[in-house]
């Protein structure tokens, strides 16, 4: 049969000639590039959270909208909701206190201090995979309970802020005094695709604590927030869980005292749910039927809700007053002897064997039960170091209250970055070391002062490469995940940053810039470091025949050493910085993948990444002064030579050794070696997407465009942490 005959037959039958059923032919379905090439470079990660996915538009100002919010009325509505039990998801003891605390905890608890990703700062609990994690069973109901409130206040309160505020109000409603609340978390409108949740393909795959400590993961099993409450790999052993607890809470930047306070405080209120076997529980929200409207885990056990609810499979109530704050967690932990038992769902837990039935039933006031604990709760009694802290909290409830208030505040605000981002009437005045505090501004340089400082920098004798390198070293520590790092504070001049291997050459310019700061006394060192980069880029552009003024916004301040947590700042030390052709001797990923990772942390787009790398190479900004990727004989001139020479087919590239990290580029005709390069250089010729961008800048008409694009991207990086002026 000919094609025309097939088409005519299809038309006569009323069918689309090309859609005959069978395989899914909708957009995005079918075999894709990553099915064929699983290791394909994820350049698309740099296109996340653009204005194309934001229904509010680029002009939306959340801080401005929040200022219109009746904050006390909002808190009043949340408080009323706590005891407004709904038949479709009845509240335990008539209160949603425990549910909302868990929702806030599990939103914030995905944060990892190693890479700054995760956390509650963008409302990611609405999206996969977090909305469908095994550890988040039933939190879809918590979020749905909040919808009428979100609907009422609209864009004056983000989902991200509302989740955490609901947890705070729940604690306050239980009689607990919180440390405070800072709003300012802005929603995004799609899942974060850059977060590495792990390599496991099956939920609840166990991870060894030692390997966990080497990776930026915040849970011991895929799909958990922290640790398996039944012990490592459901071992039922409290003491063996200590290492896993320390590893996971440590990856969030929590010490032992904060860890004990958080576990005990979180388990002072509410309960776990394990009325029957997990076989009764249906699929998660992402896999549920369309008519389920985003709700998942429907249970076939009894009514499926209330007394019949199944969440974790554990059936534990810790306190005699599960909706009111108390010290019963520690009192029960140490007062009774505990025997291992199983929940109705078959999960391992512990029961107080010598205790009377003093725990109220959540739905039948005539019933009582014995106190119960999770395996990991008992770790706080049997691990020697945790036990010391727990006994202190047992004997000093006020110390426990203070420790939990501060630890909860840290947990729920850790990924928000500097205090300048916080808004609202309940922001505490106290500066905390984990917020990377900054002093008040001392200088307010005028335009004349700035011009004078630029002249001083020009006269200093520092080269373009030195000027650019010191500014980049200062600003490029910024992480878009938790908003830490950046040039504000001039922490490049402090420990530990001044001692990092990647900064060894860059910091050589600091004594000269510090002398300028002291003698002129017109601006902070932080401003002068960034201004040095401005001077370097302007000189390089001028040498290329393009006269351009690089934007500069003063107002940065200089942090003190006592405002700098060395251990936490060491987490900002890059494993790799492809912009400076730096890679530590750590086998974690390919160099080009680490380049994408760094660019994503700097919130750069793929074109911005391309322009910056090409510019940094011709400006001679390699961390060690090497010639790798410096495809020019005009170092210090902001030309497109990197792209022109990289894409020249007259050059043939070969690896110099078996590591495939360093390459030599030889003239195809003569065999003479012309250049050396790393994977962070050659990827702009090998990856199809990056090559397409490189071709734009290699074109003969691109010289001025390249300078303008480089300046725009450079200025963006220099100002990433300027929340004081945003």
Curated annotation (Swiss-Prot):
Tryptophyl-tyrosyl-methioninium (Tyr-Met) (with W-105) cross-link site: 226-252
Cross-link Tryptophyl-tyrosyl-methioninium (Trp-Tyr) (with M-252), sequence positions: 105-226
Name used for this protein in its record: Catalase-peroxidase
Quaternary context: Homodimer or homotetramer.
EC code: 1.11.1.21
Family: Belongs to the peroxidase family. Peroxidase/catalase subfamily.
CDD domains per the UniProt record, alphabetical: catalase_peroxidase_2
Polar residues composition-biased segments: 1-13
Keyword terms of this UniProt record: Heme, Hydrogen peroxide, Iron, Metal-binding, Oxidoreductase, Peroxidase
Catalysed reactions, semicolon-separated: H2O2 + AH2 = A + 2 H2O; 2 H2O2 = O2 + 2 H2O
Ranges where the record places region Disordered: 1-34
Record GO cellular component, one term: cytosol
Ranges in a coiled coil: none
Residues the record lists as binding heme b: 267
Essential cofactor(s): heme b
Organism of this sequence: Enterobacter sp. (strain 638)
Active-site residues from the entry: 106 (proton acceptor)
């Amino acid at each position: 049969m000919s094609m025309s005959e097939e088409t005519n037959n299809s038309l006569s039958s009323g069918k689309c000639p090309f859609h005959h059923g069978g395989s899914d032919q909708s957009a995005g379905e079918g075999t894709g590039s990553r099915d064929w090439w699983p290791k394909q470079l994820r350049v698309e990660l740099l296109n996340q959270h653009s204005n194309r996915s934001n229904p509010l538009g680029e002009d939306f100002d959340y801080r401005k909208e929040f200022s219109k919010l009746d904050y006390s009325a909002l808190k009043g509505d949340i408080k009323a909701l706590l005891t407004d039990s709904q038949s479709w998801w009845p509240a335990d003891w008539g209160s949603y206190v425990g549910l909302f605390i868990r929702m806030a905890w599990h939103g914030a608890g995905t944060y990892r201090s190693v890479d700054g990703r995760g956390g509650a700062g963008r409302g990611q609990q609405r999206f996969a995979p977090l909305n469908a994690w095994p550890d988040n069973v039933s939190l879809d109901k918590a979020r749905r309970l909040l919808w009428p409130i979100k609907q009422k206040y609209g864009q004056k309160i983000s989902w991200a802020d509302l989740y955490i505020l609901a947890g705070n109000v729940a604690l306050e409603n239980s009689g607990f005094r919180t440390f405070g609340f800072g709003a300012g978390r802005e929603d995004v409108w799609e899942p974060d695709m850059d977060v590495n949740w792990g390599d496991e393909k099956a939920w609840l795959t166990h991870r060894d604590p030692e390997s966990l400590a080497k990776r930026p993961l915040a849970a011991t099993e895929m799909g958990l927030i922290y640790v398996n409450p039944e012990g490592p790999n459901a071992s039922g052993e409290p003491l063996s869980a200590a290492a896993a607890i320390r590893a996971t809470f440590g990856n969030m930047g929590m010490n032992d005292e904060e860890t004990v306070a958080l576990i005990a405080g979180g388990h002072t209120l509410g309960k776990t749910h394990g009325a029957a076997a997990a076989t009764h529980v249906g699929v998660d929200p992402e896999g549920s039927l369309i008519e389920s409207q985003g709700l998942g885990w429907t249970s076939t056990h009894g009514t499926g809700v209330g007394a019949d609810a199944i969440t974790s499979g554990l059936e534990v109530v810790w306190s005699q007053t599960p909706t009111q704050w108390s010290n019963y967690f520690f009192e029960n932990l140490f007062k009774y002897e505990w025997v291992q038992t199983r929940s109705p769902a078959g999960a391992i837990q512990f029961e107080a064997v010598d205790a009377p039935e003093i725990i109220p039933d959540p739905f039948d006031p005539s019933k009582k039960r014995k106190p119960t604990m999770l395996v990991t709760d008992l770790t706080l009694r049997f691990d020697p170091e945790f036990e010391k802290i727990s006994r202190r909290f047992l004997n000093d409830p006020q110390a426990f209250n203070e420790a939990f208030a501060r630890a909860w505040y840290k947990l729920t605000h850790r990924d928000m970055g500097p205090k300048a981002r916080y808004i609202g009437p309940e922001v505490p005045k106290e500066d905390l070391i984990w917020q990377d505090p900054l002093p008040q501004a001392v200088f307010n340089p005028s335009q004349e002062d700035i011009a004078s400082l630029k002249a001083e920098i020009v006269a200093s004798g520092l080269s373009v490469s030195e000027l650019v390198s010191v500014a980049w070293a200062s600003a490029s520590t910024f992480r878009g995940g938790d908003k830490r790092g950046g040039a504000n504070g001039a922490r490049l001049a402090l420990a530990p940053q001044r001692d990092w291997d990647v900064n060894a050459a860059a910091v050589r310019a600091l004594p000269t810039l510090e002398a300028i700061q002291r003698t002129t006394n017109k601006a902070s060192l932080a401003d002068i470091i960034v201004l040095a980069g401005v001077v370097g880029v302007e000189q390089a552009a001028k040498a290329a025949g393009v006269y351009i003024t690089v934007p500069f916004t003063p107002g940065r301040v200089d942090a003190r050493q006592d405002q700098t947590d060395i251990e936490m700042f060491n987490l900002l030390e890059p494993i790799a910085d492809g912009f400076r052709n730096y890679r530590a001797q750590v086998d974690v990923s390919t160099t080009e993948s680490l380049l994408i990772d760094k660019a994503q942390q700097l919130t750069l787009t793929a074109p911005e990444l391309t322009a910056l790398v090409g510019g940094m190479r011709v400006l001679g900004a390699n961390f060690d002064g090497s010639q790798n990727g410096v495809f020019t004989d005009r170092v210090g001139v902001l030309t497109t030579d990197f792209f022109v020479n990289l894409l020249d087919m007259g050059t043939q590239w070969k690896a110099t050794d078996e590591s495939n990290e360093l390459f030599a580029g030889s003239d195809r005709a003569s065999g003479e070696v012309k250049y050396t390069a790393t994977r962070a250089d050659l990827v702009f010729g090998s990856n199809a997407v990056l090559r397409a961008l490189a071709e734009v800048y290699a074109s003969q008409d691109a010289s001025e465009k390249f300078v303008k694009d480089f300046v725009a991207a450079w200025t963006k990086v220099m100002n990433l942490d300027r929340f004081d002026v945003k």
